[in-house]
């Protein structure tokens, strides 16, 4: 507090105390034959005290002594007040509560009737009542508590956070789909193709996030998760075995990320909201899977709202989606190269399941070699080039509507889920070229309700195909998700699948699939 403020405070307090002392002293020295108390009350305490002081000259020295003693007490109290004010200023306002208490001067203030509080007492009670009322209103308006954070194990500064999605699907297919509980394509429309019914927990996802202590600005993390579809998900139906999805470690900052291990491909990175193989949903036209890789990413802001994104990876060849036994694709001893360039607008939405931005447009592609071995007499072997070029778009319109879509073209795409999972022509041993695309509309009706509608197609080049291979795969679906709680959802999906075959009847099926999802 400034010095002139202290002097003013001291002067005001001294004048008030002096006036009170004069009134008390005059009343104490008033002689018996003085005017009645009612007259003194009508005249006011100050006037009465002054008249008595002039009438009783013999008591002047006594009154001066009393005044001097009380002035000394006042100075001591003022010094104490000044010390408290200085302490308050030094403590940044934390000592405001003690200094807010009214100044109590012993033997100066007259006794009050407890039934009639003074103005000071009333002013103390009013803030207390107001604070209590505000606290009550705030308590009533407080939102419901958020779900408790996920439990974590911690040892030597390393956190291990288990997570998962327990998923139970019930599905009915009006005709044969491959493999059945999940869908890659429709089986040929021949008499032996029958309808199907499945109850499956195979989409259940289990995993752990691992977080090490930071090294400077770098976060050190890891992830391991798996579902129950097994290493060849298109060749087994409801035969549960681990299919590892992510197994990687990473170091990242706000602008850079380095990853090593198994993770999703860089090409065509958007997922639909279909229940088919949820949460890494598949529909025709979707390219990419998970494979071992070493990856570098950078996110460079080019304005307040726009970000340039570059991702590059060296990846290992895999053959997860082998369907036919005649042709086996394998690596040639060389890695695949993958790259994606994108322009993003806004920040990733942490409330979105996939942390998507309001707008992101990307182009991506890959290049590599595959070695095909045709089983027969004689054995035939040939190396072919696998490649793709891809466009992806995710765009949020307003607060409720989002548009997602991807387009690809390429060759030898079987282990990227392209070309309807076909890599080679087993007769001529040539690579199968294909184009595909999918698009989806998502509408969030409320915090609890979401609806989705999508269509996708995968179209291999007919001249690259042999008899009995698939020439077109189409799928359209509509579904809804309802969040009973943030961690318990129910959903249902209705879809139609249509697959054309070379030399065989077209396969077509309707599919109804309700599901329950529990997140932990």
Give the residues covered by each predicted segment:
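Detector for outer-membrane/organellar transmembrane beta-barrel domains
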Residues: 339-470, 474
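Sequence/structural signature of outer-membrane beta-barrel proteins
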Residues: 173, 213, 228-233, 263-269, ...
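Bacterial N-terminal signal peptides
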Residues: 12-24
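Outer-membrane beta-barrel "beta-signal"
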Residues: 339, 482-484, 507-520
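Outer membrane beta-barrel
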Residues: 147-184, 188-320, 331-346, 353-355, ...
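N-terminal periplasmic/intermembrane-space "pro-region" immediately following the signal or transit peptide
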Residues: 27-179
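Bacterial N-terminal signal peptides that target proteins for export
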Residues: 2-13
